[in-house]
Amino acid sequence: VYKRQGIGLKSRDKNIQIACTDSQGSSMYNYFTSGNLEKKGDPSFTEGIGQARITKNLEKCEVDMSYYVDDKECIEMLFKLIKTEGLFLGTSSGVNVMGAIKMAKELGPGNTIVTILCDDANKYYDKMFNKDFLNDNGLPLPDWL
């Protein structure tokens, strides 16, 4: 959950947990797991994600869990969501969905997980649906592309 939503929800129920999911090439995962601002992995093709600094909106955010999602996991999930659910989501949303899945696996049955689907695939069309780009970056090709 984004900081403001997470803080608002947590102020109403202290049992709510806030998770940060980060893409490869960013340092937020390391920051929230070890206090270190070191980048993990190669740069991601996800635009606008993968910062290496603590911004004002993160300064007082109490993150309970942090998850790391690489581009392969993200793109596989996005292609699955297109095929099975008809959801044409962008890579930031793919990172969020994968984080929600990892959180659900960690917490187990009986919990409610909320995430934000914050972008669509139009912004990433030239990469997500480009066979050469996917092959050159070792990313999976869906059978329908």
Predicted features and spans:
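Short, small-residue-biased leader/transition segments that mark boundaries at the very start
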Residues: 1-2
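Aromatic/hydrophobic pocket-lining residues that form π-stacking "cages" and hydrophobic walls in ligand
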Residues: 5, 78, 100
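Active-site/ligand-binding loops adjacent to catalytic centers
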Residues: 11-91, 128-145
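Surface-exposed amphipathic alpha-helices with a cationic face
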Residues: 6-13, 104
